[in-house]
């Protein structure tokens, strides 16, 4: 609850910090857009919806969730698409049926979780057979700017 309260308080200022790293987000969105084209997407830890808003035109539909009601309020205030739905959810206990989504995205969050394995297991559960789990993470590099990591360490999950 303490972390959730932090993010609720931080929500209105979060976009200021994201704007400072537009280049890193733009590069990430370029990589993600082709992967979500015409697919059902679940974004976990959406924050203010930067990724969800950035891929909405490509995806068939997007469910974007976050544990912080404050973050979701900000994300909803910028939403203008019927394909995009925001809700407050704990990513360790998702209300969706098994195999509900063709793509699950959890960006910049695993290092913040007390139980990352539980969140990954839950993401795999709601992922359709043959689906795609995208878990990008930024790292601070150079002069305090965010830089995308060009390699990925993935935990294998069977979805068949």
Residue ranges and their predicted role:
Residues 117-129:
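A short glycine-rich, Lys/Arg-flanked "PGG" loop and its adjoining helix->strand segment in the class I
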Residues 105:
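A conserved beta-strand element that flanks and buttresses the S-adenosyl-L-methionine
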Residues 108-109:
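Short catalytic micro-motifs in class I SAM-dependent methyltransferases
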Residues 152-159:
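Conserved small/polar residues in nucleotide/adenosyl-binding loops
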Residues 48-93:
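Class I SAM-dependent methyltransferase SAM/SAH-binding core
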Residues 135-137:
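Acidic carboxylate diad motif detector
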Residues 1-36, 39-47, 50, 54, 141-142, ...:
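Conserved class I S-adenosyl-L-methionine
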């Amino acid at each position: 609850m303490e972390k959730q309260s932090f993010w609720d308080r931080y929500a209105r200022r979060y976009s200021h910090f994201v704007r400072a790293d537009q280049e890193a987000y733009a590069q990430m969105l370029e990589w993600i857009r082709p992967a979500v084209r015409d697919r059902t997407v679940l974004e976990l830890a959406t924050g203010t919806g930067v990724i969800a808003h950035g891929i909405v035109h490509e995806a068939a539909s997007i469910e974007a969730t976050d544990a912080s009601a404050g973050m979701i309020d900000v994300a909803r205030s910028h939403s203008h698409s019927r394909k995009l739905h925001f809700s407050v959810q704990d990513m360790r206990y998702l209300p969706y049926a098994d195999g509900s989504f063709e793509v699950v995205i959890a960006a910049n969050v695993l290092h913040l979780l007390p139980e990352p394995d539980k969140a990954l297991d839950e993401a795999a559960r709601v992922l359709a057979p043959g689906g795609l789990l995208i878990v990008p993470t930024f790292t601070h590099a150079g002069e305090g700017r965010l830089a995308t990591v060009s390699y990925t360490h993935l935990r294998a999950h069977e979805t068949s």
